[in-house]
Regions:
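Conserved beta-strand-loop surface patch within small alpha/beta domains used
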Residues: 1-88, 96-169
């Protein structure tokens, strides 16, 4: 299944600003994006970003072994977001830099641990993880709690300037 994620330009700009704010002890910021999901062909899904919620400062946990560690309160708040709106839930953070970013080993391991839990709130939607750079993105989507993640095919910034990025072969 190939998936495209469309994000309104103003929202994407706001996500970038939020993820680059300093935190008292975390090395990076984390947020959650919700998205509606539409079938866009026999083997293609379209995710339309709806909302972005930053993780509150008090929901970060000190851990010098990772860029950011968030607690169960952050996960609970995110689950409440999607439960009410029947949306896909996407955990999002930034690695900065230019070009298509890649997930770290920690990103991949932790995503494989926590993303299946999102299916308890909204079982019939895909859920996943995204990592941004300054001009691109990479995403993994899970289509069920017992499946592995599939890479997002591409991303589209909607609005002026319209831009496609993060394409995967």
């Amino acid at each position: 299944m190939k998936a495209r994620i469309k994000i309104p330009g103003a929202m994407l700009d706001g996500v970038h600003r939020d993820l680059h704010r300093p935190h008292p002890f975390a090395f990076e910021r984390v947020g959650f994006m919700t998205a509606g999901v539409a079938q866009a062909g026999a083997d293609r899904l379209l995710l339309l970003a709806r909302d972005y919620q930053p993780v509150a400062d008090e929901d970060y946990l000190p851990d010098r072994g990772v860029g950011a560690k968030i607690g169960s309160d952050a996960m609970r708040k995110a689950a409440q977001l999607v439960y009410q709106g029947r949306s896909a839930l996407l955990h999002i953070h930034s690695h900065g830099g230019i070009g298509r970013p890649e997930f770290s080993g920690i990103d991949l391991r932790s995503g494989a641990e926590f993303v299946p839990g999102f299916f308890h709130s909204v079982p019939r939607m895909p859920h996943g993880i995204l990592v941004l750079s300054q001009d691109s993105a990479t995403g993994l989507l899970w289509f069920g709690p017992d499946q592995s993640g599939d890479y997002v095919a591409d991303f589209v910034r909607v609005g002026a300037p319209y831009r496609k990025f993060g394409e995967r072969p």
